[in-house]
């Protein structure tokens, strides 16, 4: 039961592409900002700290929208189809971005916003999908690979940007493809995921919560490569079913004034859950703890370093975009080595 079969490996790999996209888009903009052709095409963006800040942060605004709505859409349309919609947003955003014309950066902002919606949706539903299809005893380790995929995305965006900087030379003859290619590549994993997702199973937990017990049991049997009547499959199936029943009864108890129709509405349930977060001190304390951990992680400035690494290296004396981009690539390798070290320790601990 504790091993991962090839079908699960494929599902988890495809599901983790969302993490790759999240990491890749974090690193791809900073590389463009120091490229000669990008600076010549969009001086109003590069020469204005405010415009550069907006181009960076508008992706986060899209991410807020995507992450907030991913829970609702994931419950209504399934985790699988919600990830498909995220792919579409990322592909749309990527190709709007490269469609920006000389001295007209509006498409840059539109592309970054829609990409943000996509990666925000991925962040909400991708790890959830991986957790729900993974064997219970491997769930924590499997979900951590989403972060591993994120780090790979960051590192590759740094090195792809460094390599593409040489297309047409690093001077005035530099090709537009130098800053466009990294963003074109950004859309490739999303397109692969959009195709591959049709071969992924639905989350068994989602199926059972929707009352599709027979499909949920078949999916569990398929994922675990065990017969439907095997005791381990039956135990996991009954645990999920009991949890779904508990959630329904708990919701009815906490919101007795809602009608039966309102209680069966996924949208009403999801909105009510946000209220439930602050309704009791215990819930608020748990959510606040998780929220503050992520808040202070961001407060450390790590994302700002990732977004503006080339400019930071230029400011400390690495003149010329090429040297700064090389130093940024080395930073990506440090991220990767640090992450894989922790992942290997987690794997060895489990084994």
Where are the language model's segments positioned?
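Transmembrane-helix signature of 12-pass secondary carriers
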Residues: 1-221, 249-351
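TPR/TPR-like (Sel1-like) alpha-helical repeat modules
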Residues: 221-227
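Surface-exposed helix-capping loop/turn segments at secondary-structure junctions
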Residues: 227-231, 251
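Short, well-structured alpha-helical segments
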Residues: 230-245, 327
């Amino acid at each position: 039961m504790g091993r991962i079969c090839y079908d699960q490996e494929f599902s988890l790999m495809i599901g983790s592409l969302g993490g790759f996209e999240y990491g890749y888009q974090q690193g791809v903009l900073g590389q463009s900002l120091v490229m000669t052709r990008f600076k010549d095409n969009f001086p109003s963006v590069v020469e204005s700290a405010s415009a550069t800040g907006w181009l960076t942060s508008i992706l986060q605004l899209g991410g807020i929208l995507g992450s907030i709505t991913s829970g609702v859409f994931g419950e209504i349309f399934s985790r699988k189809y919600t990830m498909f919609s995220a792919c579409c947003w990322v592909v749309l955003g990527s190709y709007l971005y490269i469609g920006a014309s000389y001295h007209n950066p509006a498409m840059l902002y539109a592309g970054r916003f829609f990409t943000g919606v996509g990666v925000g949706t991925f962040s909400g539903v991708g790890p959830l999908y991986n957790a729900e299809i993974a064997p219970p005893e491997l769930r924590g380790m499997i979900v951590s690979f989403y972060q591993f995929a994120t780090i790979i995305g960051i590192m590759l965006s740094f090195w792809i940007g460094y390599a593409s900087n040489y297309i047409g030379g690093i001077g005035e003859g530099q090709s537009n493809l130098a800053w466009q290619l990294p963003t074109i590549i950004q859309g490739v994993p999303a397109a692969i995921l959009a195709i591959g997702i049709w071969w992924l199973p639905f989350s068994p937990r989602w199926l059972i919560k929707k009352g599709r017990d027979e499909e949920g049991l078949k999916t569990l049997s398929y994922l675990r490569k065990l017969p439907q009547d095997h005791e381990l499959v039956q135990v996991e199936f009954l645990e999920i079913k009991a949890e779904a029943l508990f959630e329904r009864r708990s919701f009815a108890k906490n919101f007795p004034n809602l009608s039966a129709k309102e209680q069966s509405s996924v949208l009403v349930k999801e909105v009510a859950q946000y209220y439930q977060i602050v309704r009791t001190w215990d819930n608020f304390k748990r959510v606040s703890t998780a929220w503050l951990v992520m808040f202070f992680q961001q407060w450390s400035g790590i994302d700002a370093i990732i977004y503006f690494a080339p400019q930071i290296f230029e400011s400390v004396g690495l003149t010329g975009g090429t040297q700064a981009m090389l130093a940024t690539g080395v930073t990506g390798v440090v991220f990767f080595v640090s992450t894989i070290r922790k992942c290997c320790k987690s794997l060895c601990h489990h084994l």
